[in-house]
Design a protein with these regions (language model features):
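Rossmann-like NAD(P)-binding element
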Residues: 9, 30-37, 48-110, 116-117
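Internal alpha-helical scaffold of NAD(P)-dependent oxidoreductase catalytic cores
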Residues: 23, 128, 147-180, 192-221
Length: 247
């Protein structure tokens, strides 16, 4: 069974793909409204897949039955793998892991979906740094193929192998990163987005021109400013702060 902490955009996306891959999933969030929104989003996104003949209606209904939505952590002790997918704030994540560990069975693996924060630092607040790993899914999870895997200093080989097997069972591809600030994707992507913001600030081009230039000139599917909005400017800022402080 797979537990997911955080029912936001990343959490509901991970629940979506895990349930379709045949896993029983528990998605937890203290905000009842977030749980209900996640349920609605997952149903809507799966319905779109049905309409595009990517999955059948029977597969959708079976996947939805595999997901349990809960505003508490009562069922978390049953989980073999727990993935934290909360906001990109280290203090929030550390508190989640501190509260979570006493409720988990000893064999459970803990993963974080952080896009930038040190895996070793997050693992240090847990009772199982050897069973802790970074598992950075890309947004939107149902569409994006890549997952970055990041070992902390204490992550054991068995944990890494189990995490990689899980990711591959979802039909995803892994890229292994060392535990450096922002890992691989965001180490490259966020400075580019930041430079696009400066290009706008300095009047080099309009929003439309900058995005068009990168779509058509660099073959990017989405312009950097549009992408920043899609990621969330708060998340972009958090990652840039990690890069500023860590490099």
């Amino acid at each position: 069974m797979v537990g997911i902490i955080g029912a936001g955009q990343m959490g509901n996306g991970i629940a979506h793909v895990a349930a379709l891959a045949g896993y029983d999933v528990g998605i937890n969030d203290l905000r009842t409204e977030a749980i209900e929104k996640a349920r609605s989003i997952i149903e809507r996104n799966m319905s779109r897949q049905v309409s595009r003949s990517l999955i059948t209606d029977a597969e959708m209904q079976a996947a939805l039955r595999r997901i349990r939505f809960a505003p508490d952590l009562e069922t978390i002790g049953e989980m073999d793998l727990v993935i934290e997918a909360a906001t990109e704030d280290e203090s929030v994540k550390r508190k989640i892991f501190t509260d979570l560990c006493p409720k988990l069975k000893p064999s459970a693996i803990l993963a974080t979906n952080t896009s930038s924060i040190s895996i070793t630092r997050l693992a240090s607040v847990t009772d199982r740094p050897e069973r802790f790993i970074g598992m950075h899914f890309m947004n939107p999870v149902p569409m994006m193929q890549l997952v970055e895997l990041i070992r902390g200093i204490a992550t054991e080989d068995d944990t890494f192998v189990a995490a990689r097997s899980f990711v591959e069972s979802l039909g995803k591809v892994t890229a292994v990163s060392e535990d450096f600030p922002a890992f691989i994707v965001n180490r490259i992507l966020l400075p580019m987005i930041n430079e696009a913001v400066y290009t706008l600030y300095e009047g080099v081009g309009t929003v439309e021109s900058i995005d068009k230039a990168m779509r058509l000139g660099a073959n990017h599917p989405m312009g950097p400013l549009e992408l920043a909005d899609f990621i969330g400017l708060d998340t972009c800022l958090s990652v840039m702060q990690v890069l500023y402080e860590g490099l």
